[in-house]
Amino acid sequence: MSHRKFSAPRHGHMGFTPKKRSRTYRGRIKAFPKDDKSKPIHLTAFLGYKAGMTHIVRDVDKPGSKVNKKEVVEAVTIVETPPMVIAGVTGYVDTPQGPRALTTIWAEHLSEEARRRFYSNWAKSKKKAFTKYAKKWQDEDGKKLIEADFAKLKKYCSSIRVIAHTQMKILRRRQKKAHLVEIQVNGGTIEQKVDWAREHLEKQVQVDTVFAQDEMIDTIGVTRGHGFKGVTSRWHTKKLPRKTHKGLRKVACIGAWHPSRVAFTVARAGQKGFHHRTIINNKIYRIGKSALTEEGKNNGSTEFDLTQKTITPMGGFPRYGIVNQDYIMLRGAVLGPKKRLITLRKSLITQTKRVAHEKINLKWIDTSSKTGHGRFQTTAEKRAFMGKLKRDFLAEAEAKA
């Protein structure tokens, strides 16, 4: 910064270093919301799959704002959240080194998609996972051990978590291996939490029992990967003048002669994207039911738009397909590409801003094709506008013949 009368802040935030690839593509929950015994028992997280984006029209409810009671168009992200199955329960004990797992109790019956997670090659394996453990539930001595473990959880543990897995068989994805996650149980006493977890073993949990409409939540996941990138793309450093020797998209000075090494604070080329990130304060605009049920067959309609349609746009979401299961509509963008596993977690902070408490009333949801400039909202609307096509006349001719 020699010979300058002003300062130039560094380019790029050091709070996210090192910028390296995430170890896994599933968002890891490193902290859970603070427990409150006065509240009813509930789970604090859920897993979903990013389907794509669309836009909505709604009325703003902000007294005193210039856009109060006016229509606004906002981008939203659809995250498909099929029901999860609780496969086990584990308890944690507080120690000077932090929480430590005391014991884990698994359900008697684990689905094949959950057991696949414990093998790198399911086809060549003996498929013996949990076969010996399942006999505990049938043997008298084994039942005594399980009862002792449940009693141990109630006596010593300070926090209870359930082990839940997704259901890939109802997602219509190529992957058969389920995703497992530990979810902390909040509310009530330790004894009530253990009893609740035991009652829900091998049972499904819906997303609407975890989150609510208009709630602010956190999304945890791995961002879209971009591979090896240069310093200008990776750190957004200023390009050098046109006549610079040996390249413009570089850092002119990477440090002094001594110390004779490059400091870690100097912007360098390397990996960009596929980083583990947590995005806080994503507002839930809607929790939709499965399109395969009677309640959710028109889960893309609103009180103002009575058109019978689902949330899936015409032609499906690009690079994802059809959303048939329960879904969550979040305001704005969500990290990661299509099909990326997204961890949804209850907010860690107490929401005090007016935006967090605003009631959302959707007036219209766009379901036009996302592969171009969509003109029609439903196939029926397109058919009514276009009239009979050549294939329709040919089909009628074949039927008469």
UniProtKB/Swiss-Prot annotation:
Gene3D superfamilies: 3.30.1430.10, Ribosomal protein L3, domain 3 (4.10.960.10), Translation factors (2.40.30.10)
Alphabetical list of SUPFAM superfamilies matching this protein: Translation proteins
Region (Disordered): 1-22
Membrane-traversing stretches: none
Pfam families, sorted: Ribosomal_L3
UniProt-listed GO biological process terms: translation
Superkingdom in the source lineage: Eukaryota
Function per UniProt: The L3 protein is a component of the large subunit of cytoplasmic ribosomes.
Family: Belongs to the universal ribosomal protein uL3 family.
Protein name in the entry: Large ribosomal subunit protein uL3
Organism (species): Caenorhabditis elegans
